[in-house]
Every structure is written in structure tokens, then in C-alpha cells.
From Swiss-Prot:
Family (UniProt): Belongs to the EF-Ts family.
Name assigned to this protein: Elongation factor Ts, mitochondrial
Organism: Dictyostelium discoideum
PANTHER family assigned to the protein according to its UniProt record, in alphabetical order: ELONGATION FACTOR TS (PTHR11741), ELONGATION FACTOR TS, MITOCHONDRIAL (PTHR11741:SF0)
Keywords: Elongation factor, Mitochondrion, Protein biosynthesis, Transit peptide
Location within or outside the cell: Mitochondrion
Residue range of the transit peptide in the UniProt record, numbered on this chain: 1-46
InterPro entries: EF-Ts_dimer_sf (IPR036402), Transl_elong_EFTs/EF1B (IPR001816), Transl_elong_EFTs/EF1B_dimer (IPR014039), Transl_elong_Ts_CS (IPR018101), UBA-like_sf (IPR009060)
Principal location: mitochondrion
GO MF entry, a single one: translation elongation factor activity
Functional description taken from the UniProt entry: Associates with the EF-Tu.GDP complex and induces the exchange of GDP to GTP. It remains bound to the aminoacyl-tRNA.EF-Tu.GTP complex up to the GTP hydrolysis stage on the ribosome.
Amino acid sequence: MIRSLNFALRNCNKNILINSNKITINNGLLLKKNNFCTQSTSEVKVPTELVVQLRKKTQSPVQECKKALQASNNDMDGAIKWLLEKGKATAEKLKSRVSAEGIISVLVDSGSGKAVILEMNSETDFVSRGDIFRNLARDISKATLSNPISGGKLAENGILELDPTQVENIYPIKINITNEDGVAEEMTIKDSIVRIVSKLRENIVIRRASFIQPLNNNNNNSKSYISSYAHDSTSEKKDVGRLGSIVQFEYQGDCNNMNSLKEFANQLAIHIVSNSPSVVTVNDIPSSVLEECKNNNKNPESLYDDMVLYEQSYMYSPDHSVKQYLEILSEKLGIKNLSVKTFRRYAIGETAERV
């Protein structure tokens, strides 16, 4: 009997089934119910260097990398697929959790005349302040400006809106994720989120996104300039934060001082974050809001300070409204009809359901 067991132990592996008189050898235990033995994945020897390589590629925990390599018999591609499938299962388990923390990411592509503002949520502020989370938001923003966006609602002012029911339209877009070795790896936005969920163990979602489209200037030869701002007290790089805005300007003529125009554009993006307007002009106030004022015997002008950008006191020149300052600057820069074509302002959690 002992000789039979020793023979079985020497020859037992994942491909060979050894008859041992109805005694199974499994992780050193004798079981009397089966007539074969197999090698457990935990018995696969995993070289440390492979664990290190897989961790650098995927940023997954060390133990998960080891399990993936054991399950794939030390095949790197197989281990990566194993981690992705496990990550999908983890994401599925976590998706019912409330994610109301996170960041706003903003990005302008001056070459194409496009801009994006998106909200990416996590469960905790701790995760949202980490570089892994923030860098993913930056990578996703960059990818969305380099690819066509399907679905969504295109407003008259040229803003393309993706609400929570439509934002998954961007998930198939490919992005490049840089691993710890500095090597870029291509994957879909969806898979990149799955990977970070698997690593951070939190429900992570893209809540919404808005895109400024290139200016259609076929009619009046208008020019445009786009600026953005994200408020983050912990960083000098103002592209992610808990508040953010993108704003598009339109004008005619040749500007005699682009630096002054850029400075004003950046300052107005900050003004929008600070003062929370929701429309550009009085004429943009929704009819439903005006109707509500009428029903409540409330003067619509009482809304101007809070809602209308042009009617607000410009924070960098308080004696002037934003509209007045635009007129002054337009004359100073030698251009005509400097105006705000559109803007969007996001704040973390303002559309999320909290419990």
C-alpha cells in the first residue's frame, strides 16, 4: 500500500489521474471516496519574478497575482485574463453599493476645438484622492476626446450630454493604461474600470459626461476659445477636483492679445465653479422655472443672481457684471461680439443617490 501511495504522489498532476485503490491524495490528505488524485492549483510553484511582472502589468494585489498564475499554470496572458474575469465578478458584487464620492475631470483639446467634463464616482473620499483613481479619470477623459461618441443628447448650444443611462456608450472606447514599468497597455474603458475595482475593492462608476463640440462657423466666421477648471486644494494641476467647469467663448476678428483672452477665459471658468450659474443669459432660463415663479408670485429677476451668468457680478471685477466685462474686454482686445457660447459646471454627488 505504501509503495502505491508513494507512486501516486510522485505522478499526480493536473493531467494524470492515478488509481490508488479508491484512495485520493489531495494536498497531503487521504480521501476514500474517489479513485483518482489531482494536483491542486496551490501546488503550482510560482516564481517570484512572475508575480512581480504580473503585479506591474495589472496593479493587482500580490496574492491575487499569485492565484492567477497558479490557476493559469504560470502563463502570463492566461493570468491576466483570470484577473479580468475575477474583477468582473467583483464589480458585479459591488455595483449595488452607493458611490457618491469621487472627482470631476476636465480636459480641453484646443486642436480639435473639443472639451469634456465628466464625473467619476467612488464609495469613499480616500479612494478618490488616490493617484490610481485620478489618473484613470484623466486617461478616460483623454480617450473620449480622441474618439467619436455615440448616443447622448445634443443641446442647441452644442453641448453633447451623456446622463447616467447613456454614459456607458463610452465604455467600449480603447484607452492606454500605463503600468508600473511605464509601458502603455491598451484596453477598453470598461475593462480599465473593472481592473481598478478589483484592486481598490470599491464600486466605481462614471456618472455622467458633457462634451463641447467644435464651433460651426460657416455662417459668420466666428472663432472660439475653450477653457476649463477643476477645484482641488491639494494640487496645482487643475484638471481634477470636486468641482469643475468647461466654458466656450465665441468672437469675431483678430485678437490683439491672446494671453489676455486666455487669462480671462481661465478666470471665468473659476468664476463659474465659485458662483454656480446654470444658464448664460436671461433668455436661457427654462420656461418651467419661470412658470414656477409665476405660480408662487415670485419676481423672475430674483433668480438672476443665482442662475444667470451674464447677470452675476464678475468676481475679478466686482463693479461689473459678466456681460459688462465681456463688452469691455472685447473692445480692449480689438475683437467683436465676445460672448459665452456655452458652459457646464459639475459638482461631486449632486446627481447621486445617497443612503
